[in-house]
Amino acid sequence: MVQTKRQKAIDIAVVPGKAYGIDEAIKILKTATKAKFIESVDVAIRLGVDVKKSDQQVRGSTLLPAGTGRDVRVAVFVPSGAKAEDALAAGADAVGMDDLAEKMQAGDLNYDVVIATPDAMRVVGKLGTLLGPRGLMPNPKVGTVSQNPGEAVKNAKSGQVRYRADKAGIIHCVIGKVNFDDEALKLNLQALLVDLIKIKPTASKGTYLQKVSLSSTMGPGVMIDQSTLSLK
């Protein structure tokens, strides 16, 4: 296959195994963008944890200061009343209880986030086989089971991301779009890493943030030199 001059420049720019300063890494990502759509910027973070052990599982959420650039659809399970009205006022795309559950069972699952109040979990629990495999099951650890659904909806719409270390101990997360300002992407990444440090399992030994890599949807992965980040 014949490489374009641009692709050759990208291949030369990204040296395997080399850690790049955050500013240079972001510039490389933007140079490597080749899709006709606005690509997302993703981060992969290898953690020094053994997820096979229950006391070393990492799961949480972070409200990115510059958002994700995505239009997030949110469904909320909440009894009718003031809290339901708060959720709607915050921008929820669907609010309900048994009626909402019936719609989901009928195939209406076009949501990115599902939120529930604690007293609504009796209804949500029946949807485990539908929501669980899609990563939509509400969970208090990531802020999707909340006594304040209005605030939870606002956070979800404003750029809250949820994450969980996979079997290899790696966190995968979206931190924005390639058309974001460089500083916005940097701030989003730092906010995520700071929150991950806060929830470091006490049983985790050695280096916790072992490797941080950025990539665009269709671009190469770029390893980040963590010393160029502000993680305090």
Curated annotation (Swiss-Prot):
GO molecular function: rRNA binding; structural constituent of ribosome; tRNA binding
GO CC, one annotated term: cytosolic large ribosomal subunit
Any one biological process term the GO annotation gives: regulation of translation
Alphabetized PROSITE patterns for the sequence: RIBOSOMAL_L1
Keyword annotations from UniProtKB, A to Z: Repressor, Ribonucleoprotein, Ribosomal protein, RNA-binding, rRNA-binding, Translation regulation, tRNA-binding
The keyword rRNA processing is annotated on this UniProt entry: no
Sequence similarity: Belongs to the universal ribosomal protein uL1 family.
Assembly behavior: Part of the 50S ribosomal subunit.
The protein's name in its UniProt record: Large ribosomal subunit protein uL1
Organism of origin: Xylella fastidiosa (strain Temecula1 / ATCC 700964)
